[in-house]
Curated annotation (Swiss-Prot):
Subunit of the 26S proteasome which plays a role in ubiquitin-dependent proteolysis. Has an essential role in oogenesis and larval growth. Required for intestinal function and default lifespan. Residues 1-28, 52-76 are annotated as: Disordered. Part of the 26S proteasome. InterPro entries: DSS1_SEM1. GO terms for cellular component: cytoplasm; nucleus; proteasome complex; proteasome regulatory particle, lid subcomplex. The keyword Cytoplasm applies. This is Probable 26S proteasome complex subunit dss-1. Keywords: Cytoplasm, Developmental protein, Nucleus, Proteasome. Residues 7-20, 57-70 have a biased composition (Basic and acidic residues). Belongs to the DSS1/SEM1 family. It is found in: Nucleus; Cytoplasm. It comes from Caenorhabditis briggsae.
Length: 76
């Protein structure tokens, strides 16, 4: 009578193999994008042009500095 025994080494190999298989990346379907019309503008603005024009002295920062002064905290 023969019996099959599974050793810890064999179990470890099976676990490592499963982990390796799970690390594969999921493949996504190819997306179809519409063709661009001839009259469309090449320079599309996708963000605000004035992003760095914000003032550093906003109403919030003024109120915060005032509250810190009231609390006795030094302000740089």
């Amino acid at each position: 009578m023969s019996s099959t025994t599974v050793t810890k080494k064999d179990q470890k190999t099976v676990v490592e193999k499963k982990e390796t298989e799970e690390e594969e990346f999921e493949e996504f379907p190819i997306q179809e994008w519409p063709e661009r019309a001839d009259g469309e503008d090449d320079e599309v603005n996708v963000w605000e042009d004035n992003w760095d024009d914000e003032t550093h002295e906003s109403e919030f920062s003024k109120q915060l500095k005032e509250e810190l002064r009231k609390g006795g905290h030094p302000i740089a």
